[in-house]
From Swiss-Prot:
Keywords: Glyoxylate bypass, Glyoxysome, Peroxisome, Transferase, Tricarboxylic acid cycle. It comes from Neurospora crassa (strain ATCC 24698 / 74-OR23-1A / CBS 708.71 / DSM 1257 / FGSC 987). It catalyses: glyoxylate + acetyl-CoA + H2O = (S)-malate + CoA + H(+). GO terms for biological process: glyoxylate cycle; tricarboxylic acid cycle. Pfam families: MS_C, MS_N, MS_TIM-barrel. InterPro entries: Malate_synth_C_sf, Malate_synth_sf, Malate_synthA, Malate_synthase_CS, Malate_synthase_TIM, MS_C, MS_N, MS_N_TIM-barrel_dom. It is found in: Glyoxysome. Belongs to the malate synthase family. Its main location: other. It comes from the Eukaryota. The active site is at R168 (proton acceptor), D449 (proton donor). This is Malate synthase, glyoxysomal. One of its GO terms (cellular component) is cytoplasm. Pathway: Carbohydrate metabolism; glyoxylate cycle; (S)-malate from isocitrate: step 2/2.
Length: 542
């Protein structure tokens, strides 16, 4: 194995390093990140290029289907994923959120079974957010995260076992531009995974758990194979057995839905199941088929979990997971309490209850909430309908899902001016906050993250591209979209504090809603606005 000094050659950091961050950005940890980068970055780039080739095929009319070359994997009933790891047997309610210190304490104090600490869609990847998030998780694992903010004290509970920690690194498409290795920015995925794993894997094992991850945005089983290769290298490097890591894969792209068996197969000894990432799944469906008029969807509020293509995806995910002995996790309840309107709050919470009931009855092994106040509703539903720790025994052998079911876009509903304005509000509201370094934004009593903003701008793009007509009889074209964008921007900016970023957000948004240019991801489009690269420091000088 190459020495730390050798591995650090060619590694530079251009983000400021504060004293409390030095325990994370150590030469040893960065040399491990460098090893991951040099081992896997070329494969990562090849896989991203493969995504572009696949998009070109879809644009030509080659629709996704189950892969003939992996039919033997799908049809072999004998192989299984890993048995549930310590702390992951019962996952009936999981809370998700960014990794700021207050959120980490509040999440771990919630009445939930696991906490997904998020470096991805609910975090804006400023250098400070990413590195401080690592500091906060390091401290939380060691039970040394208590702190004061003004008069308020934040302390971890000591009256019970804390929820199991699961970390979501950034997706394969994102880079961490503040760290370069041999002149290239490091992958955000490998940076987030590498630092967390290096510092905490052995500590977590000693505490009776393990390094557990949620893996986002994958589009094929080959991308899962890359994670598995990274897991094997990492475990060998620190000297813990292969199979100690667990990864739950978010099925949040339409292409991954056709490769769920294969994704579990690639991660076999590291698999802890799949999750229904509903908003990103809708975004991915619009994005992949954006050039096909037969895939135009109505207002976002019409695209519920019970429409044909969403219902098919849920059923197939549960069936696939349980056939392979791994968890099938339900999706996000994004609602947040409405404190000043009891009737509206009761209606919103009833919607949460109905959604969680649908999931429990469908066979899910657990579900997500974005706010601690929703945990009790989700728990009540799952405790009643799932008295066992999970439902892995519910094989759903009644389910028969084919290509046409996953691509069935018969979604009732219409496109309205209100729907357009809602999409503009959500997109602008989220992008403005993201540019300010905030990745999780309450808008109209829903906790919006990057996925919901992606749905908003993709729908607008699609509606303009195909010249749809609203329920009010108005044709949606470029000038109409830009007119409404200006109106919504002016309204939001006038109500916001001075120094807000709504006009800057609108400049970016305007490029995405005319049916012409289409950025792969909003977060990639905006990333340069939040980078703070300064003087480069060779990592060997740390």
């Amino acid at each position: 194995m190459a020495s730390v000094e050798t591995l650090l050659q060619g590694v530079t950091i251009s983000g400021p390093i504060e004293e409390h961050q030095r325990k994370i950005l150590t030469p040893q940890a960065l040399s491990f990140v460098a090893l991951l980068h040099r081992s896997f970055n070329q494969t990562r780039k090849n896989l991203l290029e493969r995504r572009q080739l696949r998009q070109a095929e879809i644009d030509r009319g080659v629709l996704p289907d189950f892969l003939p070359e992996t039919k033997h994997i799908r049809e072999n009933p004998t192989w299984k994923g890993a048995p549930p790891a310590p702390g992951l047997v019962d996952r009936r309610v999981e809370i998700t959120g960014p990794t700021d210190r207050k959120m980490v304490v509040n999440a771990l104090n919630s009445d939930v079974y696991t906490y997904m600490a998020d470096f991805e869609d609910s975090s804006a990847p400023t250098w400070a957010n990413m590195v401080n998030g690592q500091v906060n998780l390091y401290d939380a694992i060691r039970r040394q995260i208590d702190f004061k903010q003004g008069p308020k004290e934040y302390k971890l509970r000591t009256d019970r076992t804390l929820p199991t920690l699961i970390v979501r690194p950034r997706g394969w498409h994102l880079e961490e531009k503040h760290v370069t290795i041999d002149g290239e920015p490091v992958s955000g995925s490998l940076f987030d995974f590498g630092l967390y794993f290096f510092h905490n894997a052995k500590e977590l094992v000693q505490r009776g758990f393990g390094p557990y991850f949620y893996l986002p945005k994958m589009e094929s089983h080959l991308e899962a194979r890359l994670w598995n290769d990274a897991f094997n290298l990492a475990q060998d490097y620190v000297g813990i057995p292969r199979g100690t890591i667990r990864g739950t894969v978010l099925i949040e792209t339409i292409l991954a839905a056709f490769e769920m068996d294969e994704i579990i197969y690639e991660l076999r000894e590291h698999s802890s199941g799949l999750n229904c990432g509903r908003w990103d799944y809708i975004f991915s469906t619009i994005k992949k088929f954006r050039n096909h008029s037969s895939f135009v969807l109505p207002d976002r509020s019409c695209v519920t979990m019970t429409v044909p293509f969403m219902d098919a995806y849920v059923k197939l995910l549960i069936q696939t997971c349980h056939k392979r002995g791994v968890h099938a996790m339900g999706g996000m309840a994004a609602q947040i309490p409405i404190k000043d309107d009891k009737a509206a709050n009761d209606k919103a919470m009833e919607g949460v209850r109905a959604d969680k009931l649908r999931e429990a009855r469908a066979g899910h092994d657990g579900t997500w909430v974005a706010h601690p106040a929703l945990a009790s509703i989700a728990l009540e539903v799952f405790n009643k309908h799932m008295p066992t720790p999970n439902q892995l025994f519910n094989r759903r052998e009644d389910v028969k899902i084919g290509q046409q079911d996953l691509l069935n876009m018969n979604v009732p509903g219409s496109i309205t001016e209100e729907g357009i304005r809602k999409n503009l509000n959500i997109g602008l509201g989220y992008m403005e906050a993201w540019i300010r370094g905030v990745g999780c934004v309450p808008i109209n009593y829903l906790m919006e993250d990057a996925a919901t903003a992606e749905v908003s701008r993709s729908q607008l793009w699609q509606w303009v591209k195909h010249g749809v007509t609203t329920a009010e009889g108005k044709r949606v074209d470029k000038s109409y979209a830009l007119k409404l964008l200006k109106e919504q921007t002016d309204e939001l900016a006038s109500k916001a504090p001075q120094g807000n970023k709504f006009n800057l957000a609108a400049q970016y948004f305007a490029t995405q809603v005319t049916g012409e240019d289409y950025a792969d991801f909003l977060t990639s489009l905006l990333y340069n606005e939040i980078t703070s690269a300064g003087n480069s420091l060779p990592a060997s000088k740390l």
